[in-house]
């Protein structure tokens, strides 16, 4: 009975969080085009290169999913919720004063729960569905968008998380900085991708990258901070109801579980 009640609580928690985020997506989504790189904006050469670079991480992540997720139904619920978190946050389209739009990435939560490789799998799936169902991003640019948001963003978030964990920074502060920096780094990679493929005629690649970084920074810095705060809030809710599962994933130790 305890197992059934626990699973029911986890399922209810997942539904509540996803419903809350769903309200956000439907109230904000009608604005502009989001800043996944759109269909046809990159040259075929770079589309192929970025796609090839994603493949090793995707293969590694697929193998990790089988090891981590397959044995425990409650961890499967966390896996599904982490994917929904990425889908909904990265589909939010927030207008920018620069004439573009920006969005959160949502990759911090999954990276902390499951690591960067599994987050790559979730990120690629999310980007594929967004391209097919929401015309958000594109099929030809799937590799580039995946490399930025599903590979490099999670790797940076994970690196920050482990470094801050090693020097014993409090968990909430650690999660905030990990999610925030992971979001910002995703946009740095996107700026590099755009700058390489669209160098300025006279000033070259580096000036183009600098221009894209300047365009993104105006809105992406506050968005990244907001994402960091939201990630902390969602993680604390998960920790309250699923501390045993977080312990199995190696995120909480016994003393941290007792505090919750």
UniProtKB/Swiss-Prot annotation:
GO process terms (BP): cobalamin biosynthetic process
Ligase listed as a keyword? no
State one Pfam family annotation: CbiM
Subcellular location(s) of the protein: Cell membrane
Q: Give the principal location in a single coarse category.
A: membrane
Q: List the disulfide bonds.
A: none
**Where does the UniProt annotation place the signal sequence?**
1-34
Record-level Gene Ontology MF annotations: cobalt ion transmembrane transporter activity
Q: Which UniProt keywords apply?
A: Cell membrane, Cobalamin biosynthesis, Cobalt, Cobalt transport, Ion transport, Membrane, Signal, Transmembrane, Transmembrane helix, Transport
TM segment ranges: 39-59, 77-97, 109-129, 132-152, 175-195, 215-235
Kindly tell me the pathway this chain contributes to. Cofactor biosynthesis; adenosylcobalamin biosynthesis
> InterPro entries attached here?
CbiM, CbiM/NikMN
Please report the record's description of how this protein sits within the membrane: Multi-pass membrane protein
Cellular component GO terms held in the UniProt record: ATP-binding cassette (ABC) transporter complex
Q: Does the keyword Signal apply?
A: yes
Q: Which HAMAP family match?
A: CbiM
State how it assembles: Forms an energy-coupling factor (ECF) transporter complex composed of an ATP-binding protein (A component, CbiO), a transmembrane protein (T component, CbiQ) and 2 possible substrate-capture proteins (S components, CbiM and CbiN) of unknown stoichimetry.
This chain's function reads: Part of the energy-coupling factor (ECF) transporter complex CbiMNOQ involved in cobalt import.
Family assignment from sequence similarity = Belongs to the CbiM family.
Listed name of the protein: Cobalt transport protein CbiM
